[in-house]
């Protein structure tokens, strides 16, 4: 089944394939399994296993439950910004067939913190550890304020917050890397 889905997605440009994957994952067609031997504890957070998915796939919290059902013990959504934004102009996702890889230059495209918060409010039970990756809007005049606003708004809906300071596609962001 998985090979069939991957084969099907290759007929689309990478960004459309990403959107289709998000839609499929949001339907929760998958089942999960637990293996007690793989339980991992980090800083008082218990993970079902040591495999997590970093931010970038589910940018706006649309399908993280489906991702948990694939077997990931943690999912990080985002990068979420205070206001929704479109990100960089297309094309911004490129397949490297020989390397079996993808390069993305999305630029923090997401629905914004209020929309993400409303999605998280609808979830009654999570099937794993949820992180939220946060960043400033592309045209922000005060990125530090953006981080503060988002962290305060979304931290109670997640197990942890990750602060994104390394996107080369967001002007001035890498200045925070020190």
Language-model segments: what does each one mean?
Residues 78, 82-127:
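A gly/proline- and charged-residue-enriched helix-loop-helix capping module
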Residues 25-62:
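Active-site-flanking structural segment that lines cofactor/substrate pockets
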Residues 76-88, 155, 159-166:
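Non-cysteine beta-strand/loop elements that form the S-adenosyl-L-methionine
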Residues 47, 63-85:
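Active-site cofactor/substrate anionic-group-binding motifs, chiefly glycine-
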Residues 47, 55-58, 109-178:
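Conserved alpha/beta-domain cores
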Residues 13, 86-90, 174-175:
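Short secondary-structure transition/capping segments
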Residues 2-40, 104-109:
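An N-cap/entry alpha-helix motif that binds or orients negatively charged groups
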């Amino acid at each position: 089944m998985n090979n069939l889905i991957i084969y099907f997605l290759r007929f689309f440009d990478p960004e459309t394939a990403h959107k289709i994957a998000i839609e499929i994952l949001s339907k929760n067609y998958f089942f999960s399994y637990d293996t007690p031997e793989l339980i991992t504890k980090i800083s008082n957070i218990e993970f079902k296993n040591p495999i997590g998915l970093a931010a970038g796939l589910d940018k706006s919290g649309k399908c993280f439950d489906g991702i948990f059902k694939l077997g990931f013990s943690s999912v990080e959504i985002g990068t979420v910004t205070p206001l929704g934004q479109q990100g960089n102009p297309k094309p911004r996702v490129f397949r490297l067939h020989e390397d079996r890889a993808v390069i993305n230059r999305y630029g923090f495209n997401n629905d914004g913190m209020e929309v993400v918060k409303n999605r998280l409010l609808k979830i009654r039970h999570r099937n794993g550890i949820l992180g939220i990756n946060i960043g400033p809007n592309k045209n922000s005049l005060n990125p530090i304020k953006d981080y503060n606003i988002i962290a305060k708004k979304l931290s109670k809906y997640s197990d942890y917050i990750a602060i994104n300071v390394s996107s080369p596609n967001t002007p001035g962001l890498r200045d925070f890397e020190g």
